[in-house]
Amino acid sequence: MSNMLKFGIPKGSLENATVELFKKSGWQVSISSRSYFPGIDDSEMTCKLIRPQEMGRYVERATIDAGIAGRDWVSENQSDVVEVCEMVYSKVSRRPARWVLVANGDSNVKGPEDLAGATIATELVGFTKRYFSERNIPVNVEFSWGATEAKVVDGLCDAIVEVTETGSTIKANGLRIVCELMESVPVLIANKASWADPWKREKIEQIATLLKSSLAAENMVGLKMNAPGDKVEAITSVLPSLKNATVSHLYNSDWLSIESVMSEKEVRRVIPELIKLGAEGIIEYPLNKII
Amino acid sequence: MSNMLKFGIPKGSLENATVELFKKSGWQVSISSRSYFPGIDDSEMTCKLIRPQEMGRYVERATIDAGIAGRDWVSENQSDVVEVCEMVYSKVSRRPARWVLVANGDSNVKGPEDLAGATIATELVGFTKRYFSERNIPVNVEFSWGATEAKVVDGLCDAIVEVTETGSTIKANGLRIVCELMESVPVLIANKASWADPWKREKIEQIATLLKSSLAAENMVGLKMNAPGDKVEAITSVLPSLKNATVSHLYNSDWLSIESVMSEKEVRRVIPELIKLGAEGIIEYPLNKII
Amino acid sequence: MSNMLKFGIPKGSLENATVELFKKSGWQVSISSRSYFPGIDDSEMTCKLIRPQEMGRYVERATIDAGIAGRDWVSENQSDVVEVCEMVYSKVSRRPARWVLVANGDSNVKGPEDLAGATIATELVGFTKRYFSERNIPVNVEFSWGATEAKVVDGLCDAIVEVTETGSTIKANGLRIVCELMESVPVLIANKASWADPWKREKIEQIATLLKSSLAAENMVGLKMNAPGDKVEAITSVLPSLKNATVSHLYNSDWLSIESVMSEKEVRRVIPELIKLGAEGIIEYPLNKII
Amino acid sequence: MSNMLKFGIPKGSLENATVELFKKSGWQVSISSRSYFPGIDDSEMTCKLIRPQEMGRYVERATIDAGIAGRDWVSENQSDVVEVCEMVYSKVSRRPARWVLVANGDSNVKGPEDLAGATIATELVGFTKRYFSERNIPVNVEFSWGATEAKVVDGLCDAIVEVTETGSTIKANGLRIVCELMESVPVLIANKASWADPWKREKIEQIATLLKSSLAAENMVGLKMNAPGDKVEAITSVLPSLKNATVSHLYNSDWLSIESVMSEKEVRRVIPELIKLGAEGIIEYPLNKII
Amino acid sequence: MSNMLKFGIPKGSLENATVELFKKSGWQVSISSRSYFPGIDDSEMTCKLIRPQEMGRYVERATIDAGIAGRDWVSENQSDVVEVCEMVYSKVSRRPARWVLVANGDSNVKGPEDLAGATIATELVGFTKRYFSERNIPVNVEFSWGATEAKVVDGLCDAIVEVTETGSTIKANGLRIVCELMESVPVLIANKASWADPWKREKIEQIATLLKSSLAAENMVGLKMNAPGDKVEAITSVLPSLKNATVSHLYNSDWLSIESVMSEKEVRRVIPELIKLGAEGIIEYPLNKII
Amino acid sequence: MSNMLKFGIPKGSLENATVELFKKSGWQVSISSRSYFPGIDDSEMTCKLIRPQEMGRYVERATIDAGIAGRDWVSENQSDVVEVCEMVYSKVSRRPARWVLVANGDSNVKGPEDLAGATIATELVGFTKRYFSERNIPVNVEFSWGATEAKVVDGLCDAIVEVTETGSTIKANGLRIVCELMESVPVLIANKASWADPWKREKIEQIATLLKSSLAAENMVGLKMNAPGDKVEAITSVLPSLKNATVSHLYNSDWLSIESVMSEKEVRRVIPELIKLGAEGIIEYPLNKII
């Protein structure tokens, strides 16, 4: 169908964050437990919920035109697709996912080389095999159907390659990270033919722009204050240089209004300084998007 | 009691949305599971929780001065009240409620006329009787105590008249919408004597204005950007014409600040154009009310 | 450790509100069910979760430098600490906690003096003993391990001293408030030595300023509108005088933009007047902080 | 269809108890949230879930052959059906449902006669009208769509006729029972033609026998013990006379085994006496059915 | 370790049923959310929770001595293990799991042969490939990471091979079962060396006997009654012949006590007959095990 | 009041187990969230829900006649009451509660003597003070308001005295049990005057007998089988000697029926032997009470 873009929402751990991100970007995606088809309020798009593990396969095959999934799975399947951009979900709890090599807390494994001859369980069989084979370490890699951490706790294998954000589940199970093998962030990928189609490419780029504007606004706020004319320079100099402050005259007065955008963390530092410099009527307000 | 307005909050499907709407409009309504009386932080108002089916009855009788309920139930009871305004809860999931005629998916019913002699179950007995009688189709309409869809599935009746938003529950049960009989939206209704009392009328109008301002702001956002003076006209011409943009000078510069209000959907269209036209420092911020 | 502030988050009824308050103030505090240590995204701070009953003890002893707890418990333990400021969680549901003397609904107790010789159960044993002893009323005060209301219902004691916000639980149990003994609000307290240390004091004051800015913004909103030049005076005179309105020229026009901050309740009153005075394009937007 | 019985399970408050009762009686009824049709593992029966308010209507009309519903609703609708037997769900929490006349706790209503001219809200409009009309008390009875207790609390009506088991919800709302108007128990009802059909009647009677056997076994247990021959008479005389005890010889001994059935409450009384009389090896075991 | 049996509990859909089955058989298995190791109150056993998909692998490799898993997965992996016995979880809701070929409800697929050239998604890749290859039907079988039904709904593949008990989820999604490919029941499997070890084999057989005794007792009950001597033959002839009835003399009487075991369904048939034949004091009691 | 016994149910961790135990013993105790008074279906008893920490206080003072609480708390308060009997809740998960001395996992504390001068937090202040003072170890014991484990993790104190069943929470927090200070089981205690009153004492003893009979039946089952006359001696010799087996003649046969009571664990051992010895028709049935 021409002028219709088929987009893949990643099912599972990124699902809610992606729906929320679309919402902030102006699209209502509705996922119902009664239906596998997510709805979207854009007559030029349809959505499908797709496992991250399979996103690359379906984008490559043009079942969908574009979609979001972790780079780990896109590369695991060695899918032949276009990577449009990274989508760094920047909230504190959204550190990059790290694939790590994990052994029992009391084992003697110091590095990958200590695992020659061992059995390693993982969901990421292809990547793990390539990783050890590139280092000429002979290992037996086998597919794990989930609960992978339990396997090394239980002695069902010698080590695992598992994904983690903070490492806390691993520690809580008495396991130990031997080393990190790969970091992964979500990426927006597109089918090659779709990317070559001008209408589809513009649509994909529109989506990418708006999603990234919403991500950029996470943890960012607007700060607005009034200041006497002779303090404006001092005040603007303590504001973060991310964007130039917007300064405008006030009516019947030599005061000015100053407005700027910064992260919540910078606000913590800036406000005590602004007070000292004589800014008044300081207010902070929330932002939806920063372009 | 003079200078005290008694207001009816609709119990049930509109209850939470109404409480949230009052909150956005500046009133805290607190509904406790321990008490039937909702509290409200306005010394000139008291609230009662009332079933939509009975709202008209109690407003007509002056038990309460005004209230919100679906127009379907107000008209079912043919209550003699003033309809002050519609309250279109505009979120995507809040399409108008539709009362539809529903038959089994595999029945031969093509229209109301195919139901002559049939038994029809519904909660809206009065409306349904009037509908069929106006068309001279003899039917047996009987009151259904809920789970109305089950009745036609189970063969307990030939068809039903039931309310739906999206039709998905009906389809999921293997039923089929024959035709739509009525669309209904929530309305704010007032007792006739209360409406004639100047103080009460002003109070009711204040409530109506603020609730509508909050509804108008749903899915709307503010967009602010800086632009060189010679681009202002081009930029303002791509902004939706809902409200004129607010344009002001920036300090010590020939740039201007442009600020406008639009729906989230328009933002999707507008932002790529603004970037092309040279707007900078574009930010989007949320709104509570638009008057 | 120098340049490191140890801060106590109150466990229990104020816990979520405090974490949310820090979030609004620019700090992410993460409390995990797997760990007793809340994390905080500030390299100059560590947090501990501490019962309000024990906060004074640990601040006094310098186990932590500062913390938030109800003034009731700080004074119960007669802890020797600095009270930096009150933290009035101002939302409607956050009235000051009141410690009240409670008896059975049908008892004859009119005032504390009617309880001579009686047994009184309470969690606040020290305060209650001092209260009755100052009034020369001999009573037997005993520590209650919770479910204190049940004790007077059950006849296990003659009266209780219990904390309440609205009194509704007390009434629901058929009990009666005899009189109020003390009102309590949360306070930010600091260890005396920490307060004397310049770096720690500045850090504590930074926290206090930002938390109070966030509290000040609760239930407050920004209102922005355009007005013809000759209406500005009339319009600004109906705005609440909390902060001066910010007024600025519009481009190529004799209209002005007016912006002000007020409580949601004032908005209810002001908007009908602004409309009458000719204001246009009125929008209301949310605030995070007011300094 | 011949040799097929259509049976109505009451939807709502009796639903789970009825399904459990069928289970104890040897039938697996499966109610799925995905389907309106309950399944049953008996090739001679089909089930439907039907509101108690409508059970009489559908049995009378032969839509179903038989069903269980409260006698209150069967009589409200004055359905022309056969009442096969009462089904007294005997667990402690299953007291007969009582329809009571309820007024505000502080009203002066002493009896029905004090309500002349009043408005009474109830779900049981027909019964209530007949009740007051038989006593020549003119009242305005109106249908209540639920939350009936709230109506008298809220002053929407003068009194209500409502169903209750223990009266505790009524008391908790500050209301008062004026008097009881009717007691209701579940009944098994049958269509008149179905009852006249020999095969259907035998099937209905089989169901009635087994359901009643299961109900009879609720709170009943079996008690078994050994006793010397000369104590048998004394022991059997303290056992409840509900059923004769089963006494049998033991092998190579002059001891006897005694076995009897009684309620759990009688066990509390009997066991201390049995110990005194020299019974040994006393065990208590659970029962499923007593015929 | 000698005299220690390592046993695999299947994680997932059979997990709770298996724990409950061990409980009925006299073993307390405790699965904690804090630990991957289930505990068991038998000093001769340890347990591990293992995915059914991997059970065969770990039993074959002697990581565990024995375990329970569906025969589908044991055969998928072509594990070289001993199948000790079937474990037919006989409750109504536990029909054998069926692997079925599923296509869209409105497709033209009538049998496997209509799928030549198609893409089939399944978790059971090995079995599916063998199935089609034995029939010389060329298909592309690909591994599905779950939500397999969604794939055919969504058009991501042409057909799926999926497991189902009742087919109701398939129907609810608008899909259609083309044909059944395999039925699967849980089996108890053992490692070959463990089975050759006399102590381990005896232990495995003890477990098998007790688990099967508990399964045999599901839906079975004991029935006990008294009867006059001349009715015993008639009565015992209507009892199911599963086990001989136990008949014993009553003390000082020519009545006899008759006791037998049967399924709950047979009780429905038998009780009306027993009453007609003069049996008295009929009671039904629950059973834990039948050997 | 004469002939009325006031009984205390322990609120909290033993609450549900106690209510269930009373239910098995023939008393329905109903605890409602709307009321502090548990109901009981015995016209000679009333119940109160009381914290274990306060049970001794109220029994000593005759506010109640008897109650159940942990011996730890009865002795903490040094209440002057009669201990009627232990109530060993024997289910696997109900090991005796142990009060243990706990330090950080990596501390050097080997025994109580290493804590001279330390601060110890505990809910059991009196016992802990006595324990250390008897050993002449000077420590600072302070009352902990809950979350005691967090205190030693957080460094708020040097060690804690805390209750545990399995030690797993302690280990999960990285703490270490230094030694056990006391084991505690629930006890049934009585007021001294109540115990001296013949009617009350008999009532208390009746309760004690029935509760203990129910506890004795936990994890116990009945086993029944038929055997040829010449195998009876061999068979009864393998049965546990807890109670003599009940053996009776079968009608018109030289077989005998054998019935015995044993624990579920013994059944695991016994059944394979019974099969070898020729027993037939073995069934196992559940028990409610063993006296």
UniProtKB/Swiss-Prot annotation, chains A, B, C, D, E, F:
It is found in: Cytoplasm. The keyword Cytoplasm applies. Its main location: cytoplasm. One of its GO terms (cellular component) is cytoplasm. PANTHER family: ATP PHOSPHORIBOSYLTRANSFERASE, ATP PHOSPHORIBOSYLTRANSFERASE ATP-PRTASE. The lineage of its organism: Bacteria, Pseudomonadati, Thermodesulfobacteriota, Desulfuromonadia, Desulfuromonadales. Its EC number is 2.4.2.17. It is an enzyme of class 2 (transferase). Belongs to the ATP phosphoribosyltransferase family. Long subfamily. This is ATP phosphoribosyltransferase. The keyword Metal-binding applies. Catalyzes the condensation of ATP and 5-phosphoribose 1-diphosphate to form N'-(5'-phosphoribosyl)-ATP (PR-ATP). Has a crucial role in the pathway because the rate of histidine biosynthesis seems to be controlled primarily by regulation of HisG enzymatic activity. Pfam families: HisG, HisG_C. It catalyses: 1-(5-phospho-beta-D-ribosyl)-ATP + diphosphate = 5-phospho-alpha-D-ribose 1-diphosphate + ATP. Its cofactor is Mg(2+). Pathway: Amino-acid biosynthesis; L-histidine biosynthesis; L-histidine from 5-phospho-alpha-D-ribose 1-diphosphate: step 1/9. NCBIfam families: hisG, HisG_C-term. Keywords: Amino-acid biosynthesis, ATP-binding, Cytoplasm, Glycosyltransferase, Histidine biosynthesis, Magnesium, Metal-binding, Nucleotide-binding, Transferase. One of its GO terms (molecular function) is ATP binding. Feedback inhibited by histidine. It comes from Pelobacter propionicus (strain DSM 2379 / NBRC 103807 / OttBd1). InterPro entries: ATP-PRT_HisG_long, ATP_PRibTrfase_cat, ATP_PRibTrfase_HisG, HisG_C, N-reg_PII-like_a/b, N-reg_PII/ATP_PRibTrfase_C. One of its GO terms (biological process) is L-histidine biosynthetic process.
